[in-house]
A protein has these predicted regions:
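Two-component histidine phosphotransfer core
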Residues: 1-121, 127-133
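C-terminal end segment of the histidine kinase catalytic
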Residues: 118-163
Length: 163
């Protein structure tokens, strides 16, 4: 984020509201970076400083699930675009292809199942929130190594299912 803030000449503010509790769980590499980049590039990157461009990163745990949400107060999207952005047959306007989002969504679902992935909420001229939904996998060296090697769910090493 520091590089992006420098690139955009500190034109936006980033706030974090991440529960300490979720620091004890593993995640998949490179899933939040493309979402943050989208929030900057398509959300707040072209806003005037007078419009108070802001990105909020939230993280919390609910039962056996972890949620990481990136919200911006940028231009937002039409509901039609929101519905299509994560579909294989997506039809999104040229200003955003959605490839980064569909890539992250697909990787999460391949590893953990269809109940996990991304949730996209947006309103035109209000902003966008992309929420990452993951299983709560305890942070251990073994679990993290299994995720790195593509084991879908730690504890299922013998399933022969790899990504």
């Amino acid at each position: 984020m520091n590089i992006q803030k420098y690139r955009y000449k500190e034109r936006f503010v980033t706030e974090y509201d991440v529960s300490e509790e979720i620091h004890q769980f593993c995640t998949v590499k490179l899933i939040i970076q493309p979402i943050l980049e989208n929030a900057i590039y398509y959300g707040v990157g072209n806003m005037d400083a007078d419009d108070n461009p802001r990105i909020l990163v939230k993280g919390w745990r609910t039962d056996n699930d972890i949620y990481l949400a990136v919200s911006d107060n940028g231009m937002g999207m039409r509901q039609e675009d929101v519905k299509n952005i994560l579909s294989d047959n997506k039809k999104v306007p040229k200003h955003g292809s959605g490839v980064g989002l569909i890539n992250v969504h697909t990787r999460i679902q391949l590893m953990f199942g269809a109940e996990y992935g991304l949730i996209v909420e947006s309103e035109p001229d209000e902003g966008t929130t992309v929420t990452i939904h993951l299983p709560a996998i305890p942070y251990t060296e073994e679990n993290c190594e299994l995720l790195e090697n593509g084991v879908k769910k730690p504890g299922n090493e013998g399933d022969d299912e790899k990504t």
